[in-house]
Amino acid sequence: MVGVYSSDCNVIGSIPDYGVLLDYICEKYKAKEDSGFVFRTQKTVERFDKAVESGILRFENNQHESLFISSISGDDFSLAEKMIILFWQMIYANKLFEKLTRNVFMPAMYQGRITIDAQEGLSYLRQLQQEEPESLPWAESTLSTTASKYLSILKKLGLADGSIKKTILHPTVSDKLFVYFIRWALTAEPKNRTLENPYLYFGFYDRDSLIAKLKKIDHILFWDINQLGYDIIIELKDYE
């Protein structure tokens, strides 16, 4: 039984350098042969490439793909900002990563928690397995590995630090990165241009802070805001 959820997190979590990972992705799009990684076997190459393709390089449409690739291949964002962009992209591309982030990491961050550990991820995965046994037919050892690798990913993305119990790191979202985030969320889920867009939850802002940020005069070049009571519709502008 294959199940609905993939184990891509386990492969991606084993990659030592995410800066090189971004270079590898850019090189794939430039059709270069030198990946920057050294693999022991062809099987390892195939496993790695498959995890990148299915766990990162999945897109809603061509606009979404172009937005991501241009952001990681250009010089507009720092490496730390590109890590956050990669974090958001993995949320879209990998269903299990999205569920762990939505139900474990983001609640801890929004609650102002200082630390997070693999046991929390494992507890959630066990619960998910009970709710969807056919979708997650994994052994306990695989669940445990996934919970651990998930925290490894967060650490390499700059969102956590430490060894066993990870310290939660709150990223700095610059205005430029915020503009990218809004464009990404509305491009990844184009049918929902309201604050109920499911991807807006991952922006590190509570609802009131998000509204205030959206309405900043500096952002009028990028979108229009239409408000009816407590409902807000975001209309992206073509500014490039």
What is each of the regions a protein language model found here?
Residues 43-48, 96, 140-156, 203-216:
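Short amphipathic alpha-helical interaction segments
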